Amino acid sequence: MRSPTLGVMFNHDALPSEHALRYLKAHLRNVPDFPKPGILFKDITPLLADPRALHITLDLLAQRFVGEHVDVVVGVESRGFIFGGALSARLNASFVPVRKPGKLPAATDRVAYALEYGTAELEMHKGSIRPGARVLIVDDLLATGGTASAAAELARKQGGEVAGFAFVVELDFLGGRALLAERAGDAAPVFSIVHFAAGE
């Protein structure tokens, strides 16, 4: 399949070009002390506001997973809905939202996961994933990996097979990739487009 934006063939072994990475990185904004003091927040809204940047992002995500036979894309609340929904259409896969408790109207499965202080929970509608379906977990950012790991646990709870994890941004210094590898195994590749080291 040829990308109308980049003019390249989708190849799941290909890596993003340096030009594409520079372009996307230029559309990510650092916001100091948000949502609390000491946090350097990666704001994706400039990327979303630029049609070319958004096209490139979706092209690169689809390029990586087009050969993985994905049946279901799970998007994690809330920015995972943006990328996951669009990516599911490109991969001809179903889209399933994972949300915080009390946001989904029908019966749900729920998992709890650890935060730095305390715990949080995620929910998915029961019956969203058929047993044996190959599931791709999508979110905007990989930090510690707890949220994505919980979404994968929900998918497995319904009998799904985790085919991989896809992120726009990864904070390499927070260890999320290692956590996902530990819990999901090497059979579930972790792909992030833009990487940041500490202090970037």
Swiss-Prot record:
The gene is apt. It is found in: Cytoplasm. The lineage of its organism: Bacteria, Pseudomonadati, Myxococcota, Polyangia, Polyangiales. Its main location: cytoplasm. One of its GO terms (molecular function) is adenine binding. CDD domains: PRTases_typeI (cd06223). This is Adenine phosphoribosyltransferase. One of its GO terms (cellular component) is cytoplasm. Belongs to the purine/pyrimidine phosphoribosyltransferase family. Homodimer.
